[in-house]
Swiss-Prot record:
GO biological-process terms attached to the record: proton motive force-driven ATP synthesis; proton motive force-driven mitochondrial ATP synthesis
Taxonomic source organism: Bos taurus
Domain of life of the organism encoding this protein: Eukaryota
Family membership: Belongs to the ATPase d subunit family.
Signal peptide stretch: none
Residue numbers of N-acetylalanine PTMs: A2
Designated name of the protein: ATP synthase peripheral stalk subunit d, mitochondrial
Subunit: Component of the ATP synthase complex composed at least of ATP5F1A/subunit alpha, ATP5F1B/subunit beta, ATP5MC1/subunit c (homooctomer), MT-ATP6/subunit a, MT-ATP8/subunit 8, ATP5ME/subunit e, ATP5MF/subunit f, ATP5MG/subunit g, ATP5MK/subunit k, ATP5MJ/subunit j, ATP5F1C/subunit gamma, ATP5F1D/subunit delta, ATP5F1E/subunit epsilon, ATP5PF/subunit F6, ATP5PB/subunit b, ATP5PD/subunit d, ATP5PO/subunit OSCP.
Compartment(s): Mitochondrion; Mitochondrion inner membrane
N6-succinyllysine modification, residue list: K78, K85, K95, K144, K149
Cited InterPro entries: ATP_synth_F0_dsu_mt, ATP_synth_F0_dsu_sf_mt
Keywords carried by this UniProt record: Acetylation, CF(0), Hydrogen ion transport, Ion transport, Membrane, Mitochondrion, Mitochondrion inner membrane, Transport
């Protein structure tokens, strides 16, 4: 049963190797070797444990009630399978991450379009050696001096100089 559950959750090591940074390759290789070791150990185990031959032990054990007592206790023993608390949480976080990645992707595409417009604007400006002050002020409005607000030279606030 454990082997079947593990078979469903295999790791794509090629994709995992592409994602991790170079300085983490040693840790990833160690993780991969541990995973292979544990997977091979689990593969050697049978799916169901072998049945206990209680008749053999009753015939060979000197104390008569001891084997019956062990058999009762063994049959009464129930090993609880721990409940999976974290898969739902991880799945929810994964969905949230997918949404945030999609949102970031759309924002990035809009930024790229804005930057391409700015780049096209920069490519189409007059060369600086042929520009006049008016051309410069038109292309870069932040260079224009405000003579109405600051009538005296240098026509800008002294704090910004």
């Amino acid at each position: 049963m454990a082997g079947r559950k593990l078979a469903l959750k295999t790791i794509d090591w090629v994709a995992f190797g592409e994602i991790i940074p170079r300085n983490q390759k040693a840790v990833a290789n160690s993780l991969k070797s541990w995973n292979e070791t544990l997977t091979s150990r689990l593969a050697t185990l049978p799916e169901k444990p072998p049945a206990i031959d209680w008749a053999y032990y009753k015939a060979n054990v000197a104390k008569a009630g001891l084997v019956d007592d062990f058999e009762k206790k063994f049959n009464a023993l129930k090993v609880p399978i721990p409940e999976d608390k974290y898969t739902a949480q991880v799945d929810a976080e994964e969905k949230e991450d997918v949404k945030s990645c999609a949102e970031f992707l759309t924002q990035s595409k809009t930024r790229i379009q804005e930057y391409e417009k700015e780049l096209e604007k920069m490519r189409n400006i007059i060369p600086f050696d042929q520009m006049t002050i008016e051309d410069l002020n038109e292309v870069f409005p932040e260079t224009k001096l405000d003579k109405k607000k600051y009538p005296y030279w240098p026509h800008r606030p002294i704090e910004t100089l």
